Regions:
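Acidic, proline/glycine-rich intrinsically disordered inter-domain spacer in sigma factors
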Residues: 102-141
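Sigma70-family region 2
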Residues: 13-14, 40, 53-68, 87-88
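Arg/Lys-rich amphipathic alpha helix in sigma70-family domain 2
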Residues: 62-64, 78-96, 104-108
């Protein structure tokens, strides 16, 4: 942990409101993006992000400092997300069709900024980038929850295997195996969509 993180954690433990605001300013977008990509609904992701930060603020004393603060935040967010997905599944008797609907909502532009679209020039190329992002996000939304989590953490959030292991509590071999299966499933889904 960096000195800055150590001081921030100390201030959070002292229940310093400015430290809480700093925590949200520093990590809010990352946590929201993770939650949004896992759930596929902006409002749910916003609500869940608030719950995550409230939980973190209330339970900061449980943070041992063995890992980076951001890694612990991701773990709390991932756990909240899994619980919310289970709750929504029970509440709505969620089906594959509803996951498709979530992917379509995201594809309709209700999501985070486009992956890679900022690197493409020209209107026709921008449209291609947006379409590609929609296709990829729809395919990610169709993945099993555990596979979706490792893909989002590794390929979108660009976390190391070590950080993903700390967040998920899984051994590195399991993370790599799930990531391989998830990427294979994504490749298959993307190839089908190109036909």
């Amino acid at each position: 942990m960096s000195l800055r993180e150590i001081l921030l954690v100390r201030r959070l433990r002292e229940r310093d409101e400015k430290a809480f605001k700093e925590l949200i300013a520093t990590h809010g977008d990352q946590i929201y993006n993770l939650l949004y990509r896992m759930i596929g609904n902006q409002e749910e992701a916003k609500d869940l992000a608030q719950e995550v930060f409230i939980t973190v603020f209330k339970s900061i004393d449980q943070f041992r400092g063995d890992s980076k603060l951001s890694t612990w935040l991701y773990r709390v967010a991932a756990n909240h997300c899994k619980n919310r997905i289970k709750y929504l599944a029970r509440r709505h008797d969620r089906s594959t069709t509803e996951l498709d609907d979530a992917a379509e909502r995201h594809a309709a532009g209700q999501g985070a900024s486009p992956i890679g679209a900022g690197h493409i020039e020209g209107p026709d190329r921008v449209l291609e980038g947006v379409e590609l992002e929609r296709t990829v996000q729809a395919a990610i939304a169709e993945l099993e929850e555990d596979h979706r989590l490792v893909v989002v953490l590794r390929d979108i959030e660009e976390l190391s295997y070590e950080e993903i292991c700390e967040i998920t509590g899984l051994p590195e071999g399991t993370v790599k195996s799930r990531l391989h299966r998830a990427r294979s499933a994504l490749k298959e889904k993307l190839e089908k969509s190109q036909r």
